[in-house]
Amino acid sequence: MARMSFVHLHVHSNYSLLDGASSLQRLVRTAKSLGQEALALTDHGNMFGALHFQKVCSAEGIKAIIGCELYVAPESRFDRSEHTIGRRYYHLIVLAKNETGYRNLMVLSSKAYIEGMYYKPRVDDELLAQHAEGLICLSSCLAGQLPYLLLQGRKREAEEHARKYRALFGVDNYFIEVQDHGLDEEKKVAPLLIELACRLGIPLVVTNDVHYAEQEDSVAQDILLCIGTKKNRSDPNRLKFKTDEFYLKSSEKMAQLFPHYPEMVLNTVRIAQRCNVRIPQPGPLLPLYQIPHEFSSKEHYIRHLVHRGLYDRYAVVSEEIKARADYELDVIVRMDFVGYFLIVWDFITWAKEHDIPVGPGRGSGASSIVAYALKITDIDPLRYKLLFERFMNPERISMPDFDIDFCFERRQEVIEYVRARYGNDNVGQIITFGTLKPKAAIRDVGRVLDIPLSEVLMITKLMPDDPKLTFKKAYESEQLAQMKQEPRYAELFQIAEKLEDTNRNTSLHAAGIVIGKTALTDYVPLYKDSKTGKISTQFGMDLIEDCGLVKMDFLGLKTLTLIQRTQNLVRRKGGKYTTFSISDISDQDPTTFSMLAEGKSAAVFQFESRGMQGILKRAKPSKMEDLIALNALYRPGPMAFIDQYIESKRDPGKIKYPDPCLEDILSETYGVIVYQEQVMQVAQRIAGFSLGEADILRRAMGKKKLAVMQEKKKEFAERAEKQGFDKKHAENIFEILIPFAGYGFNKSHATAYSVVAYQTAFLKANFPAEFMAANLSNEINSAEKLPLYMAEAEKMGLSIQKPDVNASEPYFSVCEGCIVYGLLGIKGLGEQVAFDVFDERIRNGPYTSFVEVLDRVPATSLNKKNAEIMIKAGCFDRFGVTRASLTAHLDDAMKYVARKKAVTSSRQASLFDETDLGECSEYTFPVMEEWSQRERLRIEKELMGYYISGHPLDEYRSVIGEKATLDLGHIENARSENKYLIVGVLNAIHPYTTKSGKNMAFGSFEDLHGSVDIVVFPVLWEEHRAQFLPETIMGLVGTVDFSKETPAFLVDSVIDLEQLRFAQVKTILAGSEHRRVSSGEKTPLQKRGVSQEVHIEVSSHVRAHAQFKSLYEILSAHTGGSGEVFLHMHVDDRTYVVYVPSCKVSATEVFAQQLKGNESFVQILKECVQ
């Protein structure tokens, strides 16, 4: 056939969520391979993919036709009633002929979401009439109103409908659409449509309702439908396409569908020729910022603000400071971004004036002295040697991008201010699309195929938790690659791969806000989020600025909320702390750096992971620059240089510079290239690049395109020669820079976030109770994090008081150095009652009895459910009535209070016997024995995720102290090759079936000091599963696995409580299999951080406790150091290593000599004392 012989005008991509199965790239490339020169995109009810589609078509040399398959309400789009006759909506294809049509299409799609949402985003005839100009309309598929009426036998109504739409869109712009996918209904309605079209003189057009690119994709699309409708493929009543003909057919196949009506095919070409839309992409257009009338221009105004700000920031404004500010202002003015800076300055100023915490900076924006003077950021770029060119490159004009952190709880207030400032119609949020990544694809497809969940989980556990994971990368796992070959899973993997990266759902970008110069619908179609009701763009983050909108990132950072909470609690201490401000703290606080150097950084922003705690112990940071470097290094890639950094920091003699002239650039990081800015500075120093050129070079290096790299290397070497460097030497330096250009971190961002990290560390070191109370409040709704922070508080030596109706506030608070449990932290307790109980106490004083609480707090708030929860949590223990009695007689007490209130209200005391009522406080609860401690604690754990008033292990403290060889609060000090006995309570156990069909289990175990995940392997699980019951107190023997971020305990054997009481540790350890230390083995010293380990070998004849007395005396005399003590004990031709908890010694020569003086029963393993 001749070129441009047919065009597909009814096409759905995977932006028709969980319906269309093919990506835009696949559809366009398939059309191109078929020799088709144009293609339409008509996704269901949306324009999500329109601009992306245009870009893909341009890249492939295909003409893009922008359209949409609208949903049309049967009557008004505002009507939400159920229609017993007809449908909730009908389909209608509209295509944009020109820019007017495209703008009308945007309005239709936007209003469908904002005004017409009812199951689907709907328009109505009123809207179509208002916005029909520039549009071509097709009557659509079987779901269209015209085919529906004809199939119903309502020919007169069908004719009226066709006439109405022809009049509405115009004689040349309305087409009757005919399809044939092999469906009975289509064969029945096609002649009726043809007859009607011929009779009315309406042109016909043939389409295929494309839902996937190729016929072979029909199975994947069928599975996708099942995912969307939450059905299994085996369900006979599920929604499904009845044939596999809904693909992008060749022109020849489309011509064969209705061979007697060739004009149907020809009309597709004519329509395509009439549709000539290029979506406008003007780039970001700044909204107008109104300056005060006394200033002649925006430039005049910003220079005034910056000049004033410099004198606020600096005690002395030097020539260097003025020059840097003038340089930046000149660049900002030349690039025409003054308005952008003023907009950002305006809403940040408003936020600070309204006491909304704002972050000190984020990203490269922290490198600007103009931003610092305007108080957009709080990072001095001169002090930290930050480069403005990393933020705004004068040689590469692009929109600056301030990412701004606000208090998590008050971020929305700033957004509302911006909305009020620039107009509600001009401000919106940004849509994002969730896609089927490998793990999600396996889970969803596995469910649809009826594969047991245990098997699906077994497969997904073989995939790393990486948001950028692809199937290709996942198959690098040998186990997963083998599993893919198993016939049982062949279809699962085949379909999951085909659906990889398919759009699955929409949501709102966590931070993105857009501002338009005029209404957003002048630039992009809009979407209304069904969960929040918030308005967003239909185009994603990467496309909106092309369309003319300005993007801002308003991030909600919980850490700012944490700092604010802590600051408020500190101020409540009174006295000198009344005016305490985090902005006034010293950045050289020795207490803070001492804590960090010990690795005690749990709950410290950016430094709380176990891995980072270990790095801190080794690196011993002593200044802010150290924190910045560690923050930048502790990431995939640069992490490989941490050892070099630490060694060079410890021993300056090991520092090596690529060239001596680079010392001033690299000295702060001890010769290691850590930051992107250092790459730029090296290029400037060696090759004479301007910083703008150096930034372009850095970006090119990061992309690692071979041809570009070779060209840049040549340029670098040639320019270095002109600077007086040897060419070969310059090429070597270029090669050194390459990995760092990719790995190197943005110093501005590392600096800003390290400042926030330091602030949290300062608060933890100096105000531990307030800091941990604030952390607990921050995570008050997190069942996972709340217990972790409570455990950390306990590890820090802080006391946590149980909830108390006369002491607790809604959030966690501090009283006399103790943390008081917050009412909102009690699981299931309503928010309203927490505030009502507190507010009433503040207004009218403490409560004197439980009944008085019921009397004073509204019953609508403190209902039976909430009262029972508070009883069980211990809120009323202070009144001397057992929780058992309060619970058992709660109904009676509530009835009593209700009667009392009725009497007081009606003033008809005579209706009741006064002796029955009296005063509320006189109500007496019958005496009842309290619940057992175990039951009381079980309920506390259930309600608060933690044991508050005690611990189930309290009565076993002596046994644990005597028998346990590992304290879970210090599990990081364990050694993976050693066997340990832990004693505690089993919190949870989860059976699991391996791929080979064997049963094992995972669980959670807790002792008095911490908790750990445990792994019980098949043999042990089969033999002892009856012993692994939740809340059982037991001993476990095994090893610690450090292969993951969080350590796990691999269980070798289980010891019940009675065995534990009477067995000796050596017997318990000897009874376990797979011993790590066998007879005669010596365990060498292994350093953990900078701490030392002292291994002492005990002679085989030493047995009784008394025989260790002299050894204990020596150890006690040398405590206070960093050497952790391990005893190597010989029993029955085996060697056991026992860790001595809470004993750290100074391994001096005196210590060694004293031990050697007792050679009759002890010797030091020589390699262990240094």
Curated annotation (Swiss-Prot):
GO cellular component: cytoplasm
Record's keyword annotation contains Nucleotidyltransferase: yes
EC number(s) given by UniProt: 2.7.7.7
Keywords tagged on the record: Cytoplasm, DNA replication, DNA-directed DNA polymerase, Nucleotidyltransferase, Transferase
Reactions it catalyzes: DNA(n) + a 2'-deoxyribonucleoside 5'-triphosphate = DNA(n+1) + diphosphate
Subcellular location: Cytoplasm
Gene Ontology annotations of biological process type: DNA replication
Cysteines paired by S-S bonds: none
InterPro entries noted in UniProt: DNA_pol3_alpha_NTPase_dom, DNA_pol3_alpha_thumb_dom, DNA_pol3_finger, DnaE2/DnaE/PolC, DNAPol_HHH, PHP_dom, Pol/His_phosphatase_N, Pol/histidinol_Pase-like
SUPFAM superfamilies the UniProt entry points to: PHP domain-like
Protein family according to the UniProt entry: Belongs to the DNA polymerase type-C family. DnaE subfamily.
Purpose: DNA polymerase III is a complex, multichain enzyme responsible for most of the replicative synthesis in bacteria. This DNA polymerase also exhibits 3' to 5' exonuclease activity. The alpha chain is the DNA polymerase.
Subunit structure: DNA polymerase III contains a core (composed of alpha, epsilon and theta chains) that associates with a tau subunit. This core dimerizes to form the PolIII' complex. PolIII' associates with the gamma complex (composed of gamma, delta, delta', psi and chi chains) and with the beta chain to form the complete DNA polymerase III complex.
Name the UniProt record assigns to this protein: DNA polymerase III subunit alpha
Encoding gene, per UniProt annotation: dnaE
